[in-house]
Regions:
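A metal-dependent hydrolase signature that marks the N-terminal structural subdomain at the beginning
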Residues: 1-28, 93-105, 112, 143
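Long, well-structured alpha-helical subdomains associated
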Residues: 9-10, 49-52, 94, 106-144
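Hydrophobic residues within well-ordered, non-membrane alpha-helices that form the packing/core
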Residues: 62, 66, 105-109
Length: 144
């Protein structure tokens, strides 16, 4: 089995897990990877390798798991407002939610017997660094 086929098999298994949870997964070229809680829909950029798509889907599934838990959903409710209005005091919640989504995605991989490679941690670090960079950027309309 080729490497790409191995990752495609794991990706397909995770798509099936998402479906079991009532989450629709779509693959589109050139889009931003995102989980939409209102639609219970995850969109993944299909331009990337199957391994990369798997890791991103694990992360987005982590966002679904946060949204599916009433306690976590309430905790992270201010995140969308913080993003939209650059509310500084809530921006740490954005980073906290991102870290938790990666963690829950990794736990889901273990739970559903989906092995991940060392590139997972590298992608996780890269994405979290990007979030930190965006969150520490100076915005003209900051509110405390």
């Amino acid at each position: 089995m080729t490497e790409e086929l191995k990752w495609a098999t794991k990706l397909n298994r995770l798509v099936n897990v998402c479906t079991m949870h009532g989450v629709k997964v779509r693959f589109k070229r050139g889009v931003q990877d995102v989980f939409s809680p209102d639609d219970k829909d995850i969109v993944i950029n299909s331009n990337r390798t199957k391994e990369f798509q798997l890791y991103v889907l694990l992360h987005e599934f982590g966002h679904y798991l946060i949204d599916a838990d009433p306690v976590l959903q309430k905790k992270f409710e201010p995140v969308s407002l913080a993003i939209k209005h650059h509310i500084v005091k809530d921006q740490v919640l954005i980073l906290e939610e991102e870290v938790l989504a990666w963690h829950l995605g990794e736990q889901a991989a273990d739970k559903y017997w989906i092995s991940i490679g060392p590139k997972f941690r590298g992608l996780k670090s890269k994405c979290l660094k990007a979030h930190i960079k965006v969150l520490t950027k100076v915005h003209p309309k900051k509110k405390e």
